[in-house]
Amino acid sequence: MAGRSGDRDEELLKAVRYIKILYQSNPYPKLEGTRKARRNRRRRWRARQRQIHQISERILSTCLGRLQEPVRLQLPLLEKLHINCSEDCGQGTEKGVGSPQISVESRAVLGSGTKE
């Protein structure tokens, strides 16, 4: 099993070469002809680009063995989020949600608010 990651790297490089060839096979349309003809060429070019992008995703997901859907990030409920601001908000008393608690010096970052 010593050479396994090298084999996988070779497969990935081969997949990237294939994807590069796909994108090179669809150059941007020429800027000649009537406005309608140019618009139609650009529309067809964008449709081909979308197809190439989808094919590229399928090639990479097959090569890397990744899932189609990204893993959903668990976010806290909006009702639980709040900004804790006492009478003197400029002293960096804001608290974040969760740990670690990070103090932010808002005056140092934002300045006094006047332009010189």
From Swiss-Prot:
Q: What is this protein called?
A: Protein Rev
Q: Where is this region: Homomultimerization?
A: 18-26
Major location, coarse class?
host cell
Q: Which organism is it from?
A: Human immunodeficiency virus type 1 group M subtype F2 (isolate MP257) (HIV-1)
Return the similarity comment: Belongs to the HIV-1 REV protein family.
One GO BP: mRNA transport
| This protein's UniProt keywords | AIDS, Host cytoplasm, Host nucleus, Host-virus interaction, Methylation, mRNA transport, Phosphoprotein, RNA-binding, Transport
Tell me, in a sentence or two, what this protein's role is. Answer: Escorts unspliced or incompletely spliced viral pre-mRNAs (late transcripts) out of the nucleus of infected cells. These pre-mRNAs carry a recognition sequence called Rev responsive element (RRE) located in the env gene, that is not present in fully spliced viral mRNAs (early transcripts). This function is essential since most viral proteins are translated from unspliced or partially spliced pre-mRNAs which cannot exit the nucleus by the pathway used by fully processed cellular mRNAs. Rev itself is translated from a fully spliced mRNA that readily exits the nucleus.
Its subcellular locations are: Host nucleus, Host nucleolus; Host cytoplasm
Q: How is it modified after translation?
A: Asymmetrically arginine dimethylated at one site by host PRMT6. Methylation impairs the RNA-binding activity and export of viral RNA from the nucleus to the cytoplasm. Phosphorylated by protein kinase CK2. Presence of, and maybe binding to the N-terminus of the regulatory beta subunit of CK2 is necessary for CK2-mediated Rev's phosphorylation.
Query: What residues bear Phosphoserine in this entry?
Result: S5, S99
Transport listed as a keyword = yes
In its keyword annotation, does this UniProt entry include Phosphoprotein? yes
Subunit info?
A: Homomultimer; when bound to the RRE. Multimeric assembly is essential for activity and may involve XPO1. Binds to human KPNB1, XPO1, TNPO1, RANBP5 and IPO7. Interacts with the viral Integrase. Interacts with human KHDRBS1. Interacts with human NAP1; this interaction decreases Rev multimerization and stimulates its activity. Interacts with human DEAD-box helicases DDX3 and DDX24; these interactions may serve for viral RNA export to the cytoplasm and packaging, respectively.
Start and end residues of each stretch annotated as Disordered = 90-116
- Give the residue interval(s) assigned to the motif Nuclear export signal and binding to XPO1: 73-84
